[in-house]
């Protein structure tokens, strides 16, 4: 569902950029969740279609980020078109391991796993490009909306959530403990997915990274293999219950009184 929202939002951002007219062009940089894995950032490529070319550049955290080459690429693209849209993961790093967002400020807050709180990647890059090239820039951070936009939920996602929940109840009823239900893809075409029960201690704080072969040689875009893998996950729609034009959420009076 997050990928569906991100792909949709990217398409709308690109469409909006058509309305922007500046003498030296405009560069919009969209920051997307992803500390070490670029699945969500790569999903911006889902905006591609007969009515949209998709973002001009996509940068994932799996590959080192070269600030100078980035600037040169933007300068080159501005020779070809007046509006550039770039997708970047919040966790992109330079070759020495420095987060790009750290280039503009220091990060002191860490979570329970010792992870630094990442924010400001798009803002830093927008300022850098504005200073180097002198064009108009926009920094867009999707932030919480990426995981909260339930009005754009994928039906496949919802059905698999039920599938995982059912498998978890079955495993618990059979006496399993300290376990976690995971999804396992069985086929791509037609798309089919099953469940497995795994030891949670072997999964917690682990990550599945985007394969290098699913990113182009220059490290500036995802391949068709990536798109083919992700696209089945965003299929189908779920219509929320609407009240006075706004989606209605499940709630309890007690819950509301403590907020």
Residue ranges and their predicted role:
Residues 102-259:
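C-terminal non-catalytic interaction/assembly regions of soluble proteins
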Residues 1-138:
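Accessory alpha-helical/coil subdomains and C-terminal extensions
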